[in-house]
Amino acid sequence: MPKRSDINHVLVIGSGPIVIGQAAEFDYSGTQACRVLKEEGLRVTLINSNPATIMTDPEMADHTYVEPIEPEYIEKIFQKEIEQGHPIDTVLATLGGQTALNAAIQLDRLGILEKYNVELIGADIDAIERGEDRQKFKDIVATIGGESARSAVCHNMDEVYATVEELGLPVVVRPSFTMGGLGSGLAYTMEDLDRIAGGGLAASPEANVLIEESILGWKEYELELMRDGDDNVVVICSIENVDALGVHTGDSVTVAPAMTLTDREYQIMRDQGIAIIREVGVDTGGCNIQFAVNPEDGRIITIEMNPRVSRSSALASKATGFPIAKLAAKLAIGYTLDEVTNDITGVTPAAFEPTLDYVVVKAPRFAFEKFPGADDTLTTTMKSVGEVMSLGRNYIAALNKALRSLETKQLGFWTKPDEYFAGERATDLQAVLEDLRRPTEGRLYDVELAMRLGATIEELYDASSIDPWFLAELKALVDFREKLEDAPVLDEALLREAKFMGLSDLQIAAVRPELAGEDGVRRLRHSLGIRPVFKTVDTCAAEFEAKTPYHYSAYELDPAAESEVAPQTEREKVLILGSGPNRIGQGIEFDYSCVHAALELSRVGYETVMVNCNPETVSTDYDTADRLYFEPLTFEDVMEVYHAESESGTVAGVIVQLGGQTPLGLAERLKAAGVPIIGTSPEAINMAEDRGEFGDLLGRAQLPAPAFGTAHSFEQARAVANEIGYPVLVRPSYVLGGRGMEIVYDEASLEDYIQRATELSTEHPVLVDRFLDNAIEIDVDALCDGEEVYLAGVMEHIEEAGVHSGDSACALPPMTLGAQDIEKVRQSTRALALGIGVKGLMNVQYALKDDILYVIEANPRASRTAPFVSKATGVHLAKAASRIAVGATIADLRAEGMIPTGYDGGSLPLDAPIAVKEAVLPFNRFRRPDGRSLDTLLSPEMKSTGEVMGLADNFGAAYAKAETGAFGTLPTEGTVFVSVANRDKRSVILAIQRLDSMGFNILATEGTAGMLRRNGIDCEVVLKSSDVREGVEGRSIVDRIRDGEVDLILNTPAGSAGARHDGYEIRGSAVTVGVPLVTTVQGVTAAVQGIEALRRGELTVRALQELDHAVKA
């Protein structure tokens, strides 16, 4: 069945900002889809609000709209494309995660698809609803002879109580049409039930929840399937969760293929999966289905399905080499599986199911340290912010590799022995077993500790519900440790066995201290000729030859085993080190820069080699770089890749400046080991990080910086703070994403900080800086080739200094800076770039106060804002930086047209659009152990997971779009609640007067209301929670927010403890109900401008391709 001839113009709906539960995997799937559809000669239009994605690059589609993924904007795109003579005839919504599916359902319900005669391809509305609606899906499972957990769909709390009476506690609560388990949970008590089911009803767009019998402790599996228009179905991959049911699959360590299924169980699941995909009606494309197996009696239950490409699809795709998203796009336009060739072999059709001759392990990356007070129990609501994948010849080797890929404090078993075995816990087996009953991030380390304290597999299974097979694998590792420890000498056979089990040199050194650390183990290993061989992912267990070089390392027991790395060409090679797992502070933006470097260097004649371990990203797609290594980003693993590449050709150098802090942290050791680092040198990177050297540079260049001092103890910190004056900003040195940073207003808070934060880093001191209150913060991206500096973009933060730049909204071009300010920025940036010795990208943060431009920090690397600046100005910064690294000058790039002539990012043409970047925060995912919300205040510590961009001709419209994209659509009428700290009251009067004149009802607390009334603003006084607690009659503001009576909240934090508690409750209830919340004075002003733009109805849509012409005209 060839391609359909009635499809000419496809709208691909992207997934929007990175949030927990929906991350970079959808950029990867959407990018593949856009490429395929364009290759097939179709016109492609894309909507996605996230600028940090490859899919929103102008080359990926004919028209790219960086707009909020909402029906009104999609309808504007339909209208605009008709006006331009290119009507859209089909929409592909199965590759943009839950966001795209929910948008498609709304388009259908509002009649927009019918109005414009547009068809949904991949999965129609009925199939989406049958897969996503809990009751419909349950009926389908029954139809095909499968079994679901006993459950009922409830629309209100009365129905919930009735169901629980029948099923008994505990129960699982799951809302419909949400992703990443948002709003779901386990209810053990009636209090739990009220909290979780109430929240679940609020989280579900359909206002219904499924209450299900608890199948906690069962084994959980997933099957990834594809179906074409001829009803051919293939099963691509089985995935098994190491954690038992009760931990969200996104938070569990998972393994592919499934390890503990019997053949009979696998066949039952396979048959049911195929019957379900047919019955649901996913006509074309991928889906994943989750099953549970009762370990006691083998009863199999179908849990749920995603009728779309999902997080698991990205994992299955990278694990097998089978390009699921690419095929889903081909099948959606009419091809069948037997008509599409598998890219990796070049000869087999996609109808051949992949076979694996290796084991894949995925491990989640968490960020609980960013949310003090959050409950770190792993439940059915997903909490991890990223993940890694590793490939090995056996399960334990793949697991060891995955754990060290995570880049947490503990790089695998035994690598943090001092901290880990501190205190009584190290010897108290019962305490460890008790801890294992509550799943947390470190549970595998707890299992290993319990084994060394003598726990049996039966005891551990009882405590953790982890299948005995996985426990036995870990027991073999613990037994091997004893053998390794007790051997009188570490000979070749024993060292080979250790490496075969996936142990790193660092882990071996921890057990054999006489080898003098990791370097000593490496020297011994090399002297014995023990190196990894590199195997190939080929989808067919070596039955056919692979055409795409996609490698992983393995140590074989046989010394004669051969590597499969063959030189592709005679070209010089450049290694690009990726950014590892997504985490807060280091996300998809860095992957974006790595991908651009790979594509650009390939284009100009280099052979590009990507090293990364993140399965969600475009950088680990098999056709992004010329060669891909799926390896941990540790010194040992990178050195072995470099050695293998050097053996098969000439390596021009390694690029470390694009992947964030991860590769930067390796730069010095790599250079010392003889690896050529191209671009900015490790010495220059260190100079920018070292406060003393950097301070000297500022002195020489006569650039002002806030006064600062360094301290190794509380006494020293107190002396520094007294000298430079409070408030001060305190932080450890060498951090990304503002880890452990705080603004401190007095000595007591300083002492509290030092006690909490000095454990962050023993060898690095704490830095104490003068904090510039109420300054304007400015973010700058620039390129430097060693001689010339190009100012790429000047962004003005909307929040004042003190909010981490990754969490602050910002505008480009800047809104309140004059020509003189920008000239100061340009000259200061030039002095810094040349003084540091930057070759490539640099990011500088400034604060402007009383007409003095202070340098806050300079980072000689690709920044978080590089993709945003690239989209807003039409200049591909990462491509330019990669060319500078291999010797091009800015003049060369100007001559090629990559960098504009006649202006820079500080002097954009007058008709250039205004771009606003807004951060997306994950507070709805985290709760305190008692179930209360976390405080949502912004601080110098970064908390956002992703970002969106708003583009328009004026600031108000751009800001309004950015807020809509970040899930905080501003209201155009209704009720506004105002409660601001005393120091902010004068600053907000004008903004509130404008809201009053637009007809909003104003609610205010007593103190704020008095000030508003004195300024002629009519408002209603509302009670604070503390008033009601003290016995005042009436409903508090928190009650009114929870009852849906408030449309916008303006609340800046106050100083006293009582006021702080009231503010915390107000902000927490805003997150629970989903009311837009503004917590800074500048944010209030911006919000009012946004509301005015919305009321004027000025929101138009323009494709990036048109804007590029406007910027470059």
Curated annotation (Swiss-Prot):
Could you tell me which residues belong to the region Carboxyphosphate synthetic domain? Answer: 1-407
Q: Which residues bind Mg(2+) 4?
A: 857, 859
- What keywords are annotated for this sequence in UniProt? Amino-acid biosynthesis, Arginine biosynthesis, ATP-binding, Ligase, Magnesium, Manganese, Metal-binding, Nucleotide-binding, Pyrimidine biosynthesis, Repeat
Per the record, the pathway is: Amino-acid biosynthesis; L-arginine biosynthesis; carbamoyl phosphate from bicarbonate: step 1/1; Pyrimidine metabolism; UMP biosynthesis via de novo pathway; (S)-dihydroorotate from bicarbonate: step 1/3
Q: Where is the MGS-like domain?
A: 968-1113
Mind telling me which Pfam families this protein's record contains? CPSase_L_D2 (PF02786), CPSase_L_D3 (PF02787), MGS (PF02142)
Identify the enzyme class: ligase
**A cellular-component GO term for this protein:** cytoplasm
Entry-linked InterPro entries: ATP-grasp (IPR011761), ATP_grasp_subdomain_1 (IPR013815), CarbamoylP_synth_lsu (IPR006275), CarbamoylP_synth_lsu_oligo (IPR005480), CarbamoylP_synth_lsu_oligo_sf (IPR036897), CbamoylP_synth_lsu-like_ATP-bd (IPR005479), CbamoylP_synth_lsu_CPSase_dom (IPR005483), MGS-like_dom (IPR011607)
Span list, region Oligomerization domain: 408-565
Task: Please provide, alphabetically and separated by semicolons, the GO molecular function terms listed in this UniProt record.
Answer: ATP binding; carbamoyl-phosphate synthase (ammonia) activity; carbamoyl-phosphate synthase (glutamine-hydrolyzing) activity; metal ion binding
Q: Which HAMAP family match?
A: CPSase_L_chain_B (MF_01210_B)
Could you identify this protein by its name? Carbamoyl phosphate synthase large chain
Gene (name only): carB
